Amino acid sequence: MAESGQPSALTTAFAPPPPLWKHFTPENVKRLEEIKKEASKGEDGKPRKKTWTPAELRALDLPPELRFLVPPEVPTEGHYSVFGELQSLSTALPSLKDQGIEQLYPSSPAAESGRDTSEPSKPLNHAYYLLKISKSLLLNFLEFVGVLSICPEQFESKVNDLRNLFINAHHLLNLYRPHQARESLIMMMEEQLSQSREEIQQMDKLKAEITDALDRLRRQGVDVDSAAGAAVQEEKPTTAEAQISDHSRLVWDLLDGDN
C-alpha cells in the first residue's frame, strides 16, 4: 500500500518533502559542522575557512545519518526527477512524434529525412497552422458540449481530441522561442544604442552651449584663457581629478555669470 501511494503523492500539486528531511535536525547539522571544522584544520591545528564541494563532503568519513545532509552533484546530462516526473537536461525541443503524440501539422522541411537538399525548401507557415488549430479547438469544444448534453458518458474521446489540439498548438508556439529570443536581444541592443546616441547628443549640445558662452565672453573683452590659467595656478591641484573638477567648476561659474 505504501509503494502504490508513493507515485500519487509525488505527482500532487504540493508534494510532500522526501523522507530524508527527517535527518536535517539541529543536532545533525551541528555534528556535520564539527566534522567539517575538524577536517579543515591545518598543520598548526587551527581550523581554516573552506568552501566544501559535495564531492569533498562525500569523501569525509560521515555516519549514515549525516550523508543525507550532503547535497548531490548537479546533473550535467541525462534526466532528473521532479515530483515523480522525469525532466530532460537537453534544451532541444523534442518532436511530438518522439513524445508519442499525434502531430496535426506537417513537419518542417529541414527535419524531413530523405529530402533532396539541393532544392530549396519552403519554410513552414506556423501562423497558418496555428489558426487552423484554433478553429479546430472551437469546433471540438462545441462538439464536446453537445456530447455532454446528449451522451455524457462518451466524453473521453472529445477530451482527448481537445488535449491533442492544445498540445500541438503549444508545440507550435514553442518553435517560435528561438525567434523570440533573437528579437528580444535585437530590441535590447537597439534600446542601448538609442540611449548611447541620446547621451552623446546631450553632451554635444552641452559642449556647444559652453563654447557659445565662452565666445560671447571673449567678444565682451573677457580673457577667458587667462582667467582659467590663473584660477588653476591659485588652486594648485595636486591630482588629475582635482584639475578636472576645478576646470568644470570654472566653466559652470562662467555659464552662471553669463546668465
Curated annotation (Swiss-Prot):
It holds the Pfam family Med7. One of its GO terms (molecular function) is transcription coregulator activity. Residues 1-55 are annotated as: Disordered. It is found in: Nucleus. Residues 1-11 have a biased composition (Polar residues). Keywords: Activator, Nucleus, Transcription, Transcription regulation. It comes from the Eukaryota. GO terms for cellular component: core mediator complex; mediator complex. Residues 24-46 have a biased composition (Basic and acidic residues). One of its GO terms (biological process) is regulation of transcription by RNA polymerase II. Belongs to the Mediator complex subunit 7 family. Component of the Mediator complex. Component of the Mediator complex, a coactivator involved in the regulated transcription of nearly all RNA polymerase II-dependent genes. Mediator functions as a bridge to convey information from gene-specific regulatory proteins to the basal RNA polymerase II transcription machinery. Mediator is recruited to promoters by direct interactions with regulatory proteins and serves as a scaffold for the assembly of a functional preinitiation complex with RNA polymerase II and the general transcription factors. This is Mediator of RNA polymerase II transcription subunit 7. It comes from Aspergillus terreus (strain NIH 2624 / FGSC A1156). The gene is med7.
